[in-house]
Regions:
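Ligand-binding clefts of soluble mixed alpha/beta catalytic domains
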Residues: 1-240
């Protein structure tokens, strides 16, 4: 969590340094005529199954200008949260994205703190934020409690709440529970929130909800039939949700 970027060699370090100076020093002056949008194939970027993990980096690169490389910060620390700078229509933007390939994209104490730092950095330099969301919630567990998930997680809400730069959120597959608020929700002052047509915005996923809502029914069902009934009820829940 200390080092932002590890370069391959001296030449790479100089190149990245120059690129970052260009991103940070834009100060509102940009040339849209030089912007080149990525080729976005939505069907290829996300898996068909909503439960299958995927790497969010190709999606980020497709959304940003192809002639300005995405410069990721702290890629080895809290990898379930991807943060970095790029350009969108020629304008420098800060990108935050859940990465389902790591911990399913869950928020935890470290990823929340990483994201909060980045939000404050972008706000200080007047850089707009693009938040790409696919999150099942906060990572549960005793380790997270001992790691200060409440204290460190609150930093992300505070960072978004006090940010004055434009902030746009895109929900790709799902956003559940408390993570809905934390990931730049309208409640925290998001400029705009968009969602793909099949995105889920809910308290919890269908399978978890069925386990609570139909607990007695499932308990009374023979064990050999319980899983099939659970799947059937979950499918019905998804259909009417």
């Amino acid at each position: 969590g200390v080092c932002h970027i590890v370069a391959d060699d001296e030449i790479d370090a100089y190149a990245r340094g120059r690129r970052l100076v260009g991103y940070f020093c834009q100060q509102g002056h940009f040339d849209r005529s030089k912007a080149e949008a990525g080729d976005i194939d939505l069907h290829a970027l996300l898996p068909e199954s909503p439960r299958r993990a995927y790497d969010v980096h190709p999606l980020i690169e497709a959304l940003l200008d192809s002639d300005a490389p995405f410069e990721e910060f702290q890629s080895k620390w809290a990898p379930s949260m991807v943060v970095g700078l790029g350009r969108l229509s020629g304008r420098t933007v800060g990108v935050l994205a859940n990465n389902p390939l790591r911990l399913g994209g869950c928020l935890n104490s470290e990823s929340a703190e990483k994201a909060a730092r980045f939000v404050r950095l972008c706000n200080a330099f007047g850089i707009p934020l693009v938040v790409i969301v696919d999150v099942p919630g906060y990572l549960p567990g005793v380790d997270q409690e001992w790691g200060g998930v409440v204290r460190r997680g609150a930093k992300l809400l505070h960072a978004f709440g006090e940010a004055e730069v434009p902030r746009v959120t895109l929900v790709t597959r799902k956003i559940y529970g408390g993570a809905y608020i934390a990931m730049n929700s309208r409640s925290l002052g998001a400029t705009k929130v968009f969602a793909w047509p099949d995105a889920e915005v809910a308290v919890m996923g269908a399978k978890a909800a069925v386990g609570i809502l139909h607990k007695k029914t499932l308990a009374a069902t023979p064990e050999s039939e319980r899983e099939a009934l659970h799947e059937e009820l979950a499918a019905e829940h998804e259909r009417i949700a």
